Design a protein with these regions (language model features):
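Short, well-structured N-terminal submotif of metal-dependent ribonuclease cores
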Residues: 1-40, 54-67, 112
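Helix-loop "lid/cap" segments that line or gate small-molecule binding pockets
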Residues: 52, 70-75
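Active-site regions of enzymes building and remodeling cell-envelope glycoconjugates
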Residues: 127-132
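Alpha-helix capping/helix-boundary segments
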Residues: 9, 44-45, 85, 105, ...
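Short beta-strand segments
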Residues: 40-42, 118
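Phosphate/NTP-binding elements of NTP-utilizing enzymes
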Residues: 48
Length: 132
């Protein structure tokens, strides 16, 4: 099965972090191995740039993400923020998920009909399918 990865999920996957749960890691690895790919919302790339600028993430995190997104063998592909995502956005309750990037990531998963791999408890309570 393919999936949409939350920002922290893709960054932890790419750095082989122990923060990533075993279930999350298996989900990503299985999708990549079986050539189903995993999706990363374009907003995650923007969010990573912002966090590097704010010095909350090292530049290497952004470099790994950009490298994965440009390497077809990585199995990580970008999911655009498009009209379908905008149409799905009202289905992500703002009172449960107040952060706009998180709402966009959740709406991307909903629009694509894929589970969202996330540790974020707010997203896990947003009424969408999640994996952790």
């Amino acid at each position: 099965m393919s999936a949409v990865l939350d920002t922290h999920t893709v960054l932890w996957y790419l750095e082989n972090s122990k923060e990533l749960s075993a279930v999350a890691r298996t989900t990503v690895e299985d999708a990549v191995r079986d050539a189903r790919h995993v999706r990363v919302s374009a907003i995650s790339l923007v969010e990573t740039v912002y966090l590097v600028e704010r010095r909350r993430l090292p530049l290497t995190a952004l470099e790994r993400l950009r490298s994965a997104l440009t390497d077809p063998s990585s199995g990580v592909i970008i999911a655009p923020v498009d009209a379908g995502v905008a149409d799905a956005l009202p289905n992500i309750p703002r009172d449960v998920v107040p952060d706009m990037p998180d709402r966009i990531i959740a709406a991307t998963a909903l629009h694509l009909g894929l589970p969202l791999v996330t540790r974020d408890r707010r997203l896990q309570s947003a009424g969408i399918q999640t994996i952790w």
